[in-house]
């Protein structure tokens, strides 16, 4: 009997130790996930530093300061407005207009008016997810990464509007583009409940198609109204080449953008082992398909290099060589 009691005590002790080890492992995994997404945010800020330098380098001297201020203000206003309403739109609209906003969540249960209002408004009960909360290690870093996606979309359109738009007008456009237009597209095609995904099987791992399509068509719509840069065309209709004032600045911006791309795509991976994870043993895309950082390393390095080489072979022009990389 004494032996049985001792054995039972040992089993209980081992059970307690195992529970403690599991708890510690979960804490470690949670802290790693938080740090992982946190580090993607400053990497993505480098994208904006890169776009700022890239655009300023391609601007004529008289408009350099205006170009830089335009980028800084767009960055700041997009993040603030994404906090106020952009994040809410992302969670509220995935199934709209296929279903009504009030008809409930999608098949994953992470969308719809009720769900968005519970987690994505910066006031009321949902403010616990939109501010400091010692028990929440995910909402803040997820929001930060998504906010940088929104700001990146605005930065892409900014380059097409060099020397064509006033600062206040551009800030308004950046808010509409980054905190609404792109967010709606992301809700439809870059969300597991999005109707483009559930109805048509649309997949866009890094949101590259959504970001560039929305930013590109948005910029095109503005350009159709604004017209060409002052001094681009002569009276006889012939075109003038408007060269940037500082190519080294543009090249530096390009390299910063490449660094930022790694952070952008890192943030697109759903890490394993958490309550919000797809799997317990491997990373996944936002759609639940398997993905690894190794795959991203191959793709980003080869894509950037291939773009530079291809543009150099066909143009021998420094600007188009850099644009080929982008």
What function would you assign to each model-found segment?
Residues 6-326:
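Hydrophobic alpha-helical transmembrane bundles of multi-pass membrane proteins
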Residues 1-5:
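N-terminal amphipathic/basic-hydrophobic helices that include classical n-h-c signal peptides
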């Amino acid at each position: 009997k004494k032996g049985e009691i001792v054995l039972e005590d040992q089993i209980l002790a081992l059970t307690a130790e195992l529970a403690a080890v599991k708890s510690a492992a979960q804490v470690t995994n949670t802290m790693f996930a938080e740090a992982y997404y946190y580090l993607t945010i400053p990497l993505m800020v480098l994208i904006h530093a890169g776009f700022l330098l890239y655009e300023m380098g391609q601007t004529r001297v008289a408009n350099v300061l205006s170009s830089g201020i335009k980028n800084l203000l767009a960055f700041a206003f997009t993040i603030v407005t994404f906090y106020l309403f952009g994040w809410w739109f992302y969670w509220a609209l995935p199934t709209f207009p296929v279903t009504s906003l009030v008809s409930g969540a999608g098949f994953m249960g992470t969308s719809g008016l009720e769900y968005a209002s519970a987690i994505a408004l910066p006031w009321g009960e949902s403010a616990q997810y939109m501010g400091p909360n010692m028990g929440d290690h995910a909402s803040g870093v997820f929001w930060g990464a998504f906010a940088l996606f929104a700001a990146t979309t605005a930065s892409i359109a900014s380059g097409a509007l060099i020397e064509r738009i006033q600062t206040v007008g551009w800030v308004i456009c950046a808010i509409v583009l980054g905190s609404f237009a792109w967010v709606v597209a992301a809700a439809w095609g870059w969300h597991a409940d999005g109707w483009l995904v559930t109805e048509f099987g649309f997949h866009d791992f890094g949101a590259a198609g959504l970001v560039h399509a929305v930013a590109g068509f948005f910029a095109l719509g503005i350009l159709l109204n604004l017209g060409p840069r002052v001094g681009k065309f002569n009276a006889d209709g012939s075109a003038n080449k408007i060269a940037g004032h500082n190519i080294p600045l543009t090249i530096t911006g390009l390299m910063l953008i490449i660094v930022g791309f790694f952070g952008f795509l890192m943030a697109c991976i759903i890490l394993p082992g958490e309550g919000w994870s797809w799997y317990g043993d491997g990373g996944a895309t936002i759609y639940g398909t398997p993905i690894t950082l190794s795959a991203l390393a191959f793709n980003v390095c080869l894509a950037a290099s291939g773009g530079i080489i291809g543009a150099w072979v066909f143009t021998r022009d420094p600007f188009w060589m850099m644009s080929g990389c982008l």
